[in-house]
């Protein structure tokens, strides 16, 4: 049963149980909207598996750990980053005066119950066994393979079959049942290489005319990918790196086995100028070619401080690289050319552009991935029920493959086969 994420993007909480009574929760997140949206409550659960460290998958896990003593299984990088993400979640909830079902004591319990688990190592869970596979998407993201002896299940979490500068591509495995995210169902991405080249050309054009480029970026994954991408510029760019992305990069470098070319990331990180004080921010405004900082949707973070100072400079630019949720600062900037900065609507004279560098599988990638698993049953989740899910149902349903969509908080049953499972 989906307690969240069944008919929506984010807010993921999936409860699985079979006839033996073995059970598990996959993710327990929230939608960081205003106000936030939470999944329904789950009771008496001993094990949860967290696919990756984004808020919509892990935000409420401390409550599980503190309330039910739930063990929180995740990859080592995810485990090392949860504290940073959870503390930031608590801080924002306090500032915005939003309700949060856990407190700092619960956070400490969440940290105590983390169980770092490497990729590909089988783990026992009641009558089942399970293991992680690389999901792409961001560093530490994992797909979950569950072997129920007679049925093999694959839960993708967020995944991408296209490699990035810091992640490998997700590889399909054989499964009887696949739960696939469908964020981009019905939509295909432009070629990533073309978007990257367009981004680099735009950065160099702005520098040539004497401007600065502000790149608001998501802290986990996007900031590090952009740092590596900027390395390919023909210019010796002076990059100033601010915000939570800087801290996340340091955590990534503590897990080099989970990062593609960690030596390259470390070299580029050392080359960048790390912003750690107000004085450093003033230096960035005076000297930087590129300022890379959070937040990726311009909802807060140092990015607004920089934008407030660049607002009247038509030579400079703000380059967004991710989906901008309606209601976010980035969405307002793209649609209206203005943004709320500390409660005041401000018109921005800078050039503004969007370079979509999503690390979710697009429609075609989802279809190809699912077909390659050979699954007889497919459940689409983490997707829009009005557009994305119908498009994927139409593309995937065949006489030999059933495709399911599920509402939240409605129990559903999938058949178990008698086929044997192999290691």
Model-predicted regions and their roles:
Residues 26-29, 45-56, 60-61, 72-76, ...:
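Active-site neighborhood of phospho(di)ester-bond hydrolases with catalytic His/Asp-centered motifs
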Residues 136-141, 149-176, 181-184, 188-190, ...:
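Active-site-proximal loop/helix segments of hydrolase catalytic cores
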Residues 162-242, 317, 340-404:
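Cap/insert and terminal regions of metallo-dependent hydrolase folds
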Residues 243-256, 318-357, 402-422:
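Short, flexible loop segments at boundaries between secondary-structure elements
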């Amino acid at each position: 049963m989906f307690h969240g994420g069944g008919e929506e993007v984010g807010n993921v909480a999936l409860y699985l149980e079979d006839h033996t009574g073995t059970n598990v929760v996959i993710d327990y997140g929230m939608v960081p909207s205003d106000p936030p949206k939470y999944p329904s409550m789950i009771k008496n659960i001993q094990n949860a598996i967290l696919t990756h460290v984004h808020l919509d998958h892990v935000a409420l896990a401390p409550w599980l750990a503190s309330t039910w003593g739930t063990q929180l299984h995740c990859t080592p990088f995810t485990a090392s980053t949860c504290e940073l993400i959870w503390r930031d979640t608590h801080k924002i909830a306090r500032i915005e005066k939003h309700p949060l079902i856990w407190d700092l004591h619960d956070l400490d319990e969440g940290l105590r119950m983390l169980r770092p688990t490497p990729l590909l190592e089988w783990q026992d869970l009641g009558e089942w066994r399970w293991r992680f596979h690389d999901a792409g998407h961001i560093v530490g993201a994992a797909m979950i393979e569950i072997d129920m002896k007679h049925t093999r299940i694959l839960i993708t979490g967020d995944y991408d079959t296209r490699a990035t500068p810091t992640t490998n591509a997700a590889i399909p495995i054989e499964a009887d049942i696949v739960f696939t995210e469908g964020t981009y169902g019905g939509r295909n991405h432009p070629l990533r290489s073309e978007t990257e080249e367009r981004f680099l050309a735009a950065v160099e054009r702005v520098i040539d005319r004497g401007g600065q480029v502000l790149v608001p970026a998501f802290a986990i994954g996007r900031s590090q990918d952009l740092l590596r991408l900027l390395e390919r510029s023909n210019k010796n760019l002076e990059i100033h790196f601010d915000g939570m992305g800087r801290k996340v990069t340091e955590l990534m470098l503590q897990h080099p086995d989970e990062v593609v070319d960690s030596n390259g990331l470390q070299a580029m990180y050392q080359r960048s100028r790390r912003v750690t004080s107000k004085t450093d921010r003033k230096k960035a405004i005076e000297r930087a070619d590129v300022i890379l900082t959070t937040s990726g949707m311009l909802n807060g973070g140092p990015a607004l401080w920089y934008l407030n100072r660049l607002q009247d400079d038509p030579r400079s630019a703000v380059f967004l690289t991710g989906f901008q949720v309606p209601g976010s600062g980035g969405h307002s900037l793209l649609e209206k050319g203005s943004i709320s900065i500390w409660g005041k609507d401000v018109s921005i004279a800078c050039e503004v552009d969007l370079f979509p560098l999503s690390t979710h599988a697009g429609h075609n990638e989802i279809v190809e991935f699912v077909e390659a698993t050979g699954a007889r049953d497919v459940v689409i989740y983490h997707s829009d029920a009005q557009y994305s899910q119908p498009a994927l149902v139409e593309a995937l349903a065949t006489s030999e493959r059933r495709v399911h969509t599920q509402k939240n908080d409605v129990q559903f049953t999938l058949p178990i086969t008698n086929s044997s499972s192999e290691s």
